[in-house]
């Protein structure tokens, strides 16, 4: 089972999905344009975290609504939910019957997830360049401008106009890879879908 800080790192990576879901091959300008225009996206994901000692794979679904609303639900091999309601990030571990809540600004304020609430973050926080193609997927490399960002780079891959994959390499050499499916770049989402109330009987912790 992943620790909370790893979950937030994954959230940080995936927040970029809003910016790239309709980018075309070699079109960093199109990526920027979509970042300015996109308001929401939903779909499914498979996440793999590779470290020197082990590899972990998880599956789930996600939805994002700008500004600043997101929900990530892990369904296999464990059940966890991450909800950002604009003020608070809620991490609900179903198996542990435990909820951890954190200030949204503190949890993701310095990470790529800031793009969720600030459309200028893409260009202000990253240096973007085309990064070639592999297995029919075209990549854009996003390098953080801050030296203490905690990760080396993010690679954003798209195929046939659709978001296909993302990769993040952290400062310790661990790599998180995500593949996407069932994307909807114009989902009918309401703000109410991102409200979270801790279930009765669970422990609630504050960071």
Curated annotation (Swiss-Prot):
GO terms for cellular component: periplasmic space. The keyword Signal applies. Gene3D superfamilies: Lipoprotein localisation LolA/LolB/LppX. One of its GO terms (biological process) is lipoprotein transport. Keywords: Chaperone, Periplasm, Protein transport, Signal, Transport. It comes from the Bacteria. Residues 1-23 form the signal peptide. Coiled coil: none annotated. Pfam families: LolA (PF03548). The keyword Iron does not apply. It is found in: Periplasm. InterPro entries: LolA/LolB/LppX, OM_lipoprot_carrier_LolA-like, OM_lipoprot_carrier_LolA_Pbac. Monomer. Belongs to the LolA family. PANTHER family: OUTER-MEMBRANE LIPOPROTEIN CARRIER PROTEIN (PTHR35869:SF1). Participates in the translocation of lipoproteins from the inner membrane to the outer membrane. Only forms a complex with a lipoprotein if the residue after the N-terminal Cys is not an aspartate (The Asp acts as a targeting signal to indicate that the lipoprotein should stay in the inner membrane). This is Outer-membrane lipoprotein carrier protein. It comes from Neisseria meningitidis serogroup B (strain ATCC BAA-335 / MC58). The gene is lolA.
